[in-house]
Amino acid sequence: MTRVTMDQDTENKVLVIKNMDSGYLVAGEQVTLEDVSYDATEPLAEDELMVQLLYATYDLFKRDLASSSADATELRGRKPVETMSIAQVIKSNNKQFQEGDMVIGRLPVQQYVLIKADDATELKLLENPCEFDDIRLFLSVLGVPGLLAFSSLYEIGRPKKGETILIAGASDEIGQLVGQMARLEGLKVFGSVESDEKLDFLITELGFDGGFNYAKESPYEALPRLVPNGIDIYYDNLSWMSRLNIGGLDTHFDLLGSRHLNAAFSSMRRYGRIMFYGTIAEQTVLDPIIGMFLHNTVLKRLTIRGFGLSDPSFGKKWGKLHMERMQQWVKEEKLKIPTFEITGMDNAAKAFVEAFYSSENTHTHTILAVT
């Protein structure tokens, strides 16, 4: 490790949200960098440590923002952006962490972060038994996104060889991972995306059997064409986006989620499984639709279940197997993890906006390399 020499003049910038409810996000306006004043030479209190941020990802921050909880409301106020990050300990007065240790956890997007004693318990040492050179994997397939995709597919989807899965909103990191895992289990995999470029990427690079561009083709037309014999698993990865309420995305994804769900119901086979991340949009279950919704559920003996990573039967239950199997698949190069990296703290706001508006970018896992 290169030792960082810090003094009172050491630059320390933090990414701050000013206002996320005033139209499309623009780097430098709603999301900006601010200077953080601190004395880096001051001794650390007991159990405190100082870390230098290396990598941050905004993808899961979007899902936090889409939550209907009070915490998500607080995220919209003027405050530092906090997200899953990898950092290196550069100074420690905590017995659990030594100088040079790599740690992972939810941190502010800030060059240098003083971790108070109470917050230190939320950090974890970055364990890398397979000695992967690319530690960014622990923010994607080997981290929370991978665990979310893995636990939901196996806990609810219960994939069986020969079945068919449809992933609505398959172009983001979760959708890509679910599709690749389903393919490894011998399923026929179809996905919906927002551009021809992303559809081509899913098919040619990730091995999807097919899909459709929902900007050009309605799911009511696409599903009979793609899956005339029906689908066994429907993975709703669109409806949660209706909670974003950013730059018109709420209305856009609300309508898309409704149309996908209604079309999927008509194509579900008996004993099919339907899963939703977080919360579905209100318009998805309006009164005119709910009768059909319930009728098909009973008629086709469907299982419908929402999920969140904190549920006991998800992250906690599947954590060990997720890490074992995912590491093996990564070592065997059976999974592709497309990553779009933006380098430098000065580009932190740009990377944040890119995570929300990435229609031109097929590599939808956006990573900020701080140093």
Curated annotation (Swiss-Prot):
UniProt entry tagged with the keyword Electron transport: no
Pathway: Secondary metabolite biosynthesis
Nucleus as UniProt keyword: no
Disulfide bonds: none
Function text: NADP-dependent oxidoreductase; part of the lna gene cluster that mediates the biosynthesis of diastereomeric piperazines. Lna and lnb clusters encode sets of enzymes that produce overlapping sets of previously undescribed metabolites such as piperazinomycin-like metabolites or morpholine. The lna and lnb biosynthetic pathways appear to be part of a signaling network that controls the formation of sclerotia, a resilient overwintering structure. One primary function of the non-canonical nonribosomal peptide synthetases lnaA and lnbA consists in the reduction of L-tyrosine.
Family: Belongs to the NADP-dependent oxidoreductase L4BD family.
PANTHER family from the UniProt entry: PROSTAGLANDIN REDUCTASE, PROSTAGLANDIN REDUCTASE 1
Protein name: NADP-dependent oxidoreductase lnaE
Organism, as annotated: Aspergillus flavus (strain ATCC 200026 / FGSC A1120 / IAM 13836 / NRRL 3357 / JCM 12722 / SRRC 167)
Lineage per the UniProt record: Eukaryota, Fungi, Dikarya, Ascomycota, Pezizomycotina
Gene: lnaE
